[in-house]
Amino acid sequence: MLNLSMKDMIQSGVHFGHQTRYWNPNMKPFIFCKKNKVHIINLEKTLIMFEIAMNELSKISKRDGKILFIGTKRAASEAIKNSAINCNQFFVNYRWLGGMLTNWKTVRQSIKRLKELESQSKDGTFKKLTKKEALIRTRTLNKLENSLGGIKNMGGLPDAIFVIDVEHEKTSIKEANKLGIPIFAIVDTNSNPKDIKFVIPGNDDSIRAIDLYLKTVSETIKNSKISNKEINKKIIIKNN
């Protein structure tokens, strides 16, 4: 059962779409009305589609699937990181590097380099270098951590991605579709829902709305893992 109400969504401004002149006609089925030249999203549909999406994410989580949270714009960045960490999943919140999914072999080499530099910074190697060389390596480490820190322990491609703002994250969506990775996304009235497997119509600009989505997703994933562990414990006890 989805721990989210219509009241929660209204208070967070989930229903506010973009100005009508910026709309994508493919979002018409999810629009309730126009008000002051702004499209109002049909929250009854949002609630239903959110529940469908969370049920599917729960299934992926229960089988220990890897879920990648993606949101690189300023309004989403910090919440993306915190939500992924909260449910022990993965994230990209700084900048999407082209080929992060479709060129995983190269990304894996960069992750290897990141881990080497992390190790060197902790074991005293940096202190043995010249100031200039230590500075260069520190900058490289910080750059790699910003870009790859959220996926350095992913160990392979994700089983699903959850995206805030499909218009802003077009490259990651294109890559996921190319590889057949299921996409769960918040889709605003200015975006095209056609390439998204699990559409959740909603405001993708409001910080309060973004926080609400991510808290719901994170807790859903976290709770599904807890319930799965409890089921497994009962099976073990029963067999013994």
From Swiss-Prot:
Any one Gene Ontology molecular-function term assigned to this protein's record: structural constituent of ribosome
HAMAP family: Ribosomal_uS2_B (MF_00291_B)
Gene3D superfamilies: Glucose-6-phosphate isomerase like protein, domain 1, Helix hairpin bin
Family, as annotated: Belongs to the universal ribosomal protein uS2 family.
Gene (name only): rpsB
Record's keyword annotation contains Cell inner membrane: no
Keyword vocabulary terms for this entry: Ribonucleoprotein, Ribosomal protein
Top-level taxonomic group: Bacteria
CC annotations in GO: cytosolic small ribosomal subunit
Gene Ontology biological-process entries: translation
Name of the molecule in the record: Small ribosomal subunit protein uS2
SUPFAM superfamilies the UniProt entry points to: Ribosomal protein S2
